[in-house]
UniProtKB/Swiss-Prot annotation:
Its EC number is 1.6.5.-, 1.7.1.17. FMN binds at residues 9, 15-17, 93-96, 137-140. This is FMN-dependent NADH:quinone oxidoreductase 2. The keyword ATP-binding does not apply. The lineage of its organism: Bacteria, Pseudomonadati, Pseudomonadota, Alphaproteobacteria, Hyphomicrobiales. Pfam families: Flavodoxin_2. It comes from Bradyrhizobium diazoefficiens (strain JCM 10833 / BCRC 13528 / IAM 13628 / NBRC 14792 / USDA 110).
């Protein structure tokens, strides 16, 4: 079994989402010692945002030589995702949504003919067999009963993205209110780490 581990926080060892995503991977490794893990840190090895020349090349136009490294990185990222049985993502909320580094990664895996296709009844996801677990951290509280709920574009966006490619039941472990104060951060992190250790292994 193969697991792809993605981190996107810019905070390094101070990141809550990184701590929780690591705990998720540790839990799955304990349950399946033979688990093969591929790790990609989107801040240490950032992907370029899509360009017009990249999109043109993807649609069959001649690719200039200088685009070669970008196309190679795109192919590597897509192949990592396609090969994975399980995908674990550390995703903090930045300005109400995902980090731009994670958006650049998503732009490389949402590829027509690979992870989705257009059919007579509209788009159809092709990646439904994968398990996706996301460790999210948010500075405030964005529950459905909160006045800030309309500003939540992290979990809602990721649910839509993964649903679009056929993964209709992504799992989320959340650490909320981490910027409200030290006590809130400690409690949120402890709860998320406990949820990670209690995660169903298969």
């Amino acid at each position: 079994m193969k697991l792809l581990h993605i981190d996107s926080s810019v905070l390094g060892p101070h990141s809550v989402s990184r701590q929780v995503s690591a705990a998720i991977v540790d839990r799955l490794r304990q349950a399946t010692p033979s688990l093969e893990v591929v790790y990609r840190d989107l801040t240490q090895t950032p992907l370029a945002h899509l360009s017009g020349s990249h999109l043109a090349a993807a649609q069959g136009a001649p690719a200039p030589a200088e685009l070669g490294p970008d196309l190679a990185a795109s192919a590597a990222v897509l192949n990592e995702f396609l090969a994975a049985d399980v995908v674990v993502i550390g995703a903090p909320m930045y300005n109400f949504t995902i980090p731009s580094q994670l958006k650049a990664w998503i732009d490389r895996i949402l590829v027509a003919g690979k992870t989705f296709q257009y059919g007579a009844n509209g788009p159809q996801g092709l990646a439904g067999a994968k398990r996706v677990i996301v460790a999210i951290s948010r500075g405030g509280y964005y529950g459905a009963d909160m006045p800030t709920a309309a500003g939540e574009h992290l979990e809602t966006y990721l649910r839509w993205v993964f649903g679009f490619i056929g993964i209709t039941d992504p799992e989320f472990i959340s650490a909320d209110g981490i910027q409200v104060g030290p006590d809130h951060r400690e409690k949120a992190l402890a709860g998320a780490l406990q949820a990670a250790t209690s995660l169903q292994a298969a």
